[in-house]
Amino acid sequence: MDLRPLVLALGVSAACRGREATPQARYEARVFAGGVAPPAGAPQAGKNPFRGDRQSAVEGERTFGVMNCDGCHGGGAVGWVGPSLRDGRWRYGGSDGEIFQSIYYGQPHGMPAYGGLLPPGAIWKLVTYLQSLEPPADVPTQSWK
């Protein structure tokens, strides 16, 4: 039996050991949804062309479900693994343009970039949906005692 392929595979495996990103580095890295990076020359977030449009909010809600946003942000965007998107506490800014940028380019610490999968119009409709959500009546706060 020829053991050369096995020896070669083990050698390559040993040579690659230790080159994996640390858990911290993987956590801080930007992640591209579906492995597809946003295209070069991506649009700058400006004014939301769908702001306040109810039908666009409905389409954005559909995108929220189809793209599995609720898998991290919970049903109705109330928060789960990812933060709540309806309590007014925006980590990277809560303006339409800032939310667009977060969805399009992603953010370190777990928010994938969807600019490679979704066209800008779909992202704006998702922003419209998120901005249409009412904040919960009982926003939990942290006690500093």
Provide a role label for each language-model segment.
Residues 13-15:
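C-terminal motif of bacterial Sec signal peptides marking the signal peptidase cleavage site
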Residues 51-62, 74-104, 110, 117:
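Gly/Gly-Pro-rich "capping" loops immediately C-terminal to redox-active cysteine motifs
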Residues 69-72:
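Short cysteine clusters
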Residues 17-56, 66-67, 112-145:
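Flexible coil segments in periplasmic/lumen-exposed cytochrome c-class electron-transfer proteins
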Residues 2-8:
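Sec-dependent signal peptide recognition
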Residues 8-10, 99:
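Intrinsic disorder/low-complexity segments
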